[in-house]
Amino acid sequence: MNVRLKRAKELVGYAVQLTKDEGLPTMVKRGAGFVKRRCFGKRARYLPAKKVLEAQRAEMAGKTAADCGLPTISVLTPLYNTPEKYLREFLDSFVGQTAPNGQLCLADASDAAHGNVERIVKEYQQKNQQIVYKKIENQGIAANTNAAAQLATGEYLALADHDDILAPHALYTMGKAILQLRQRGEPDGFLYSDEALFTKSIRRPMVAHFKPDYAPDYLLCCNYICHLAVFQKALWEQLGGERPECDGSQDHDLFLRLLEKTGGAAHVPQVLYYWRVHAGSTSGGADAKPYVAAAAKKALADHLTRTGRTGTVEDGLFPSTYRVKWDIVGEPKVSILIPNKDHTEDLEKCLHSIWTKTGWEHFEVIVVENNSTDPATFAYYKKAQQRYDGLRVVTYPKKGFNFSGINNFGRKYATGEYLLLLNNDVEVRSGEWLTELLRQCAHPGGAAVCGAMLWYPDETIQHAGVITGLGGYAGHSHKYKKAGGSGYMFRTATVQDFSAVTGACLLVKTSVWDEVKGLDEAFAVAFNDVDFCLRVRDAGYRIAWTPYAQLTHYESKSRGGDEKDPVKARRFAAEQQRLYEVHGKANILHDPYYNPNLTMDREDFSESDDLRGLKEGRITVQWRE
């Protein structure tokens, strides 16, 4: 079938399905956005407007690296048999920077048949004295990069491949971001930006990688940082540069070692780097360079050793992803709290799956009875306690439903070092679910809270982490996405850092629960889990989510919202307002583990229809530990 015809049929099918799932108004809005981007906004959509670039050039007119007021950034680029077209485009991107605060350090290991590489570079040196060049013997990518670093005189270093392109405002933006960090008194040792992939022209990019702020668990699963990374030269020298034994994943290894020194990184949500996709490039996938995986696993294993943590590094669910199976310290007991009102069929399915599928043996289950009215429920409780050794049923003394109050009451009876909040309409799928949740928490430097992958019965995602700000308040990552995919930038296939996870399945250290005083009972139904996780985060702890703990959540996709009942609608609105009051609207709307260039209207990680931050060249930077 003709490729264009096939694509057209796919788009029509998508439009029909979207209309069925979300209604005609949503389909029309999405369609209008698609047409706008495709026909009018596709070109150069990640570049600042022409007037913004001109203003930057005017600001820097007549200035040099020494007097422009920005820290000098030396870009390290090893050359090896670089095709002329790619080389010229790369050099043009450096020469065309809007600020003069750059130095380009080229270490050329090209063979004798590619003497034109040196000739082309020398041609460009006539245009720009900030280009320095050295001919070297080829010793591999890490050693060649180290050779380029020996030419550097800048306070900062950056890494760029010889076939890629720097955005015209890359060095200006990074220089300004460093100054912002200094003005705020924040660490400025390591920064990174967003990037885009392209084939022919950066004015027609394929896709952007809009990254979260520094996310340590995510980085252990894949090198999401990539380009453009900028770091202090002094740190590079302390580390001894890149390690040849990690060739193929030398940058990932470097970033891990840098972070051991800095304790965190700063993220600039601007597309400052264009990564060319072609045969043989890592942007085209791990299959292009098979040795990458072995090098990455070595880098990760060495990082664990250096940081005093123990675990096994394995291949992840998809190429270019990895999994750290942390060693659990001790044999911690988990107290599973399950609120229940009638619905004994759901509860039995839940309990049966726990006792028949859970590999971790050290747990207790506490069912918190909440105002059941069916006599059969109490008969079931007696039978269940005989059937399931260690099951206890305790009775919540207050009337009405208050999820927070019920779980706070259940905690009084818990004896475990960890608490697990679990809905009664959840069924265990994988035997290692509880073990995996503990792996993320019960090791030195682990998270305080961890959530699981929850599936609807039709094998679409119900929960893969919570993003604050979606829809104005909070939403679930990749909700309704079908099984089999990896999500945006592998985010449903790798352990993730999140601001919150759902209380339908939430593991937390009991000591942390007690420290933040449990759930806030002012959030009776909605946002209690979000509020809890944000308070845990504010106390200095991390929230993790893992795809390796899998459960089915029988929550109905078509369940009606609280807006249909006036009383419930008022309660829901009050809880929404309280979320803003407690945590601040600005904080809710800016989730550090999301990206301002992604949509706030949907849960699918699609690109925002509003990219004004990019078009205006808006410089914001956030440092995070």
Task: For the regions a language model picked out, list residue spans one by one.
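C-terminal, non-catalytic tails of nucleotide-sugar-dependent glycosyltransferases
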Residues: 2, 6, 13-68, 289-331, ...
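Nucleotide-sugar donor-binding/catalytic module of glycosyltransferases
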Residues: 40-288, 302
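Short, acidic, metal-binding catalytic loop of nucleotide-sugar glycosyltransferases
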Residues: 92-101, 352-362
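A conserved acidic beta->alpha catalytic loop
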Residues: 108-119, 369-380, 427
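Glycine-rich, basic loop-to-helix element that forms the pyrophosphate-binding segment
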Residues: 136-152, 396-414
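Conserved donor NDP-sugar-binding/catalytic core segment of glycosyltransferases
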Residues: 169-205, 426-473
